[in-house]
């Protein structure tokens, strides 16, 4: 267990007055969690301190070689003012997997969860009260050796920051248009596609901007070898309901193992659906659309939870899904997931972790 020292701010920030205008990641809370790593000493000096910049040398290796990882999760306020997390242990395990791939010392699962709970407890007044709004939590580690040699750092900083964030669907769930990217790729076997590291996201910006210029909300990524099998959409996993069955790419090294993805699969199986995790060719998806068998398409992720898709375009061909409306399975998943997260329905899966008042 971490011995977390807490230094509270003497200059608290003004909290947002209008929670309907929070946006995402624009305003940050009063405090942050910080812990240092030194080779030979390990992780040490766990602390919660006032939110502030890090003084870093221009030659700090993370600026040059991107040795860093991050996570994304949320804290929710229920109607009875309970603050709760959703499957934080899953984020902790994925954080370890990302660390291993980037040669970063791992944070023990229980320490990761304790650090998140402690910071959320200290910042519980920042968790929004508005329905659909939440406190976004961003844990991250970066290398902070100074020097230009290409090698694993001997020093790291683990930090967690929080940002109150508005409802993703402030005006209701509106299905989106997706562009199937067949030039740029997001990941390839042996690389870092299964991790949450900044390089993956930086490399996706170009294709995302080009798609946005054409009026599409997201990019659907194909595999990096043959460019024929679907993998992810934007920064989310994606699922296809075809002729009664649900298909999604397997997490075999090029696809991020999303916590929301995993949860949706478990729910779908509970409800009796066949869920096939494996290779699914974009050509087969388009053919299913032509035959009227492509019933629903939706992305899954922390930010949106479930994001319905109304249109795919690939090589100039358009596939229209569900008359442009959210499908019944997509809606049921969204209602069930958000219902548990905000405490509106019972947590029958044991996924919810209440944040106790300790700090």
For every predicted segment, state its role.
Residues 122, 142-144:
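Intrinsically disordered, low-complexity linker/loop segments enriched in Gly/Pro
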Residues 109-111, 119-132:
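Charged, gly/pro-rich active-site loop segments
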